[in-house]
From Swiss-Prot:
Positions with biased composition (Basic residues): 470-479
Keyword Coiled coil: yes
Coiled-coil region list: 179-231
Phosphothreonine, modified sites: T236
Protein name, entry field: Topoisomerase I damage affected protein 11
Phosphoserine modified-residue sites: S244, S286
InterPro entries linked to this entry: Tda11 (IPR031388)
Transmembrane segments: none
Compositional bias segments (type: Polar residues): 257-287, 332-359, 368-377, 491-504
Biased composition, class Basic and acidic residues, residue ranges: 290-301, 403-421
Keywords from the UniProt entry: Coiled coil, Cytoplasm, Phosphoprotein
Main location: cytoplasm
Length: 504
């Protein structure tokens, strides 16, 4: 035997303990030839086999436990009498602690004491002291009683809460202030909860709206991508689309001006545009968009202007038009009055000069817009009518004075003045008749009866160096009775016959 094994056996005999059943399975004892089987006198119903091996051996000991007898005395947890003594000594010390722990674990929740529970507690203690009920049974009974008392208290509390609610709904003289304050606090809490729910719902709606806008944007982008893939214009060669970036770089205003000022016929522009219609479909700017942008710009500019800017501009324009027309007429009258002899001698030259003056004034008039030209024509027609009426009144007054005084020089000067004023109103037919043209023999001039009689009283005709006949011109004013001048019978005199309007 090994010394280590001898030492273990001696200790086991002294302590009367089998270490092979309590220690680990592995042992350091050497292997014996016959193998040792230990069967303790204090076997507990199991056959214990323990094979010891040396430290040098490779075989480990293995414990085999096989039940042999099943009796209450041979129970594996039951120990020897000495062992029971030791165990009871240790258990006697640890039992109160264990019971206290069990009591703390089994004890229910602490509830406020009521008169019923206080009456139950002394009876429990009395039963414990007098009748000798074990501790475990008393703890179970106390827990059951505590649960029953808790249920009764919960019922009482619910009934009290119902009564308090009834008291709040139907106020009486003896209402408790604490109950009112409690109900007030509960109402405030309910209102706060409602507000919180409303705020949460608002936040949720905002979040949903943001999600909706984001998804709508994504949908729009997807539609654009699909349209790009399906649009055949994007699959055309680059040569057909080379002009589009240049067209995009041109400012919008210049494009609209070029579109408005284009004078090419539509038949020429259509074939050119038909080839590029598909390519410009997605990139070109439609005229409706241009008009809308112009209207927006005009509205913004008009809103920026003051309220008095338009009336002042209109008055200034009206003043300029009247001033221009009056200056033109005054300069024309001055030029005609500066050279009366030339105008009287050569009426054709007067027509040529008037035509040249019209040609010189035409470019200025052509530069005006159609609206300005129509306004100027209407204004000038009104001014000319007023002027003609004023001159007619002045002329009649002058003629009345001359007939009363019978002064030939004054009458002649008056006739010359009338000739100057009426030279710019001579028609082409009248000029042709004065020049002796054959095509104007059938033309006739109408004069009033009173003026015809005044002409007969004075010197009615003048002759020039070449012997041709010239007639003095008078402006025609408002009258009901008219007369015409007949064709000349000879070179020296002319026959003048007065007729009524009915004869004509």
């Amino acid at each position: 035997m090994n010394k280590f094994d001898e030492f273990i056996e001696s200790n086991e005999k002294d302590l009367d303990v089998d270490t092979s059943t309590r220690n680990s399975i592995i042992s350091m004892s050497p292997v014996r030839k016959t193998g040792r089987k230990i069967r303790s006198a204090s076997s507990n119903g199991y056959r214990l086999e323990h094979h010891r091996t040396s430290s040098a051996g490779s075989m480990h000991s293995q414990r085999l436990m096989t039940p042999t007898r099943l009796n209450d005395q041979d129970h594996p947890l039951q120990a020897k009498p000495d062992a029971r003594r030791v165990v009871t000594r240790h258990s006697s010390v640890s039992v109160p602690n264990a019971m206290s722990k069990r009591r703390s674990l089994i004890q229910p929740m602490v509830v406020p004491t009521t008169p019923e529970s206080q009456n139950n507690l002394p009876s429990v203690s009395h039963s414990e002291g007098s009748y000798g009920i074990p501790l475990e049974s008393t703890t179970v009974l106390s827990s059951e009683q505590a649960m029953a008392s808790g249920l009764r208290r919960s019922r009482n509390g619910s009934s009290q809460s119902v009564n308090s609610m009834i008291a709040t709904t139907i106020p009486t003289n003896g209402v408790d202030v604490s109950a009112l304050l409690q109900s007030l606090a509960t109402k405030e809490l309910e209102l706060l909860e409602c507000k919180q729910k409303i705020e949460d719902l608002k936040k949720q709606t905002q979040h949903e709206e943001q999600n909706y806008t984001r998804r709508a944007r994504e949908l729009h982008e997807l539609k654009e991508q699909v349209s790009k893939h399906l649009d055949p214009s994007l699959n055309t060669p680059v040569k057909n689309r080379a002009f589009s970036p240049v067209y995009q770089n041109i400012p919008l205003e210049s494009r609209t001006e070029n579109a408005g000022n284009s004078s090419l016929p539509s038949s020429v522009s259509k074939p050119k545009n038909m080839g590029h219609q598909s390519t410009n479909q997605s990139r070109s700017v439609s005229p409706q968009d241009i008009q809308e942008r112009r209207q927006r710009d005009d509205s913004s500019d008009s809103s920026k202007q003051s309220l008095w800017s338009k009336p002042l501009a209109l008055f200034n324009q009206f003043d300029k038009i009247i001033q221009h027309e009056i200056e033109r007429t005054l300069n024309w009258d001055d030029s005609l009055s500066g050279t009366p002899e030339v105008q009287e001698g050569t009426p054709t030259s007067n027509s040529e000069s008037s035509a040249q003056q019209y040609d010189n004034e035409a470019p200025g008039a052509r530069q005006k817009s159609p609206s300005q030209g129509s306004v100027s024509r209407s204004l000038w027609s009104f001014v000319s009518d007023v002027k003609a009426g004023l001159l007619g009144i002045e002329e009649e007054n002058d003629n009345d004075v001359i007939t009363d005084n019978r002064c030939d020089p004054v009458y002649k000067s008056d006739r010359q003045h009338e000739q100057k004023k009426s030279t710019h109103k001579i028609t082409n037919r009248g000029q042709a008749e004065d020049s002796g043209d054959d095509s104007s023999l059938n033309t006739r001039k109408f004069k009033t009866t009173t003026k015809f009689q005044k002409d007969n009283a004075g010197n009615n005709s003048l002759t020039d160096e070449s012997g041709h006949r010239t007639r003095e011109k008078k402006s025609k004013r408002s009258s009901n009775k008219l007369s015409f001048i007949g064709e000349p019978d000879n070179d020296n005199s002319s026959v003048k016959n007065s007729v009524e309007m009915t004869d004509f």
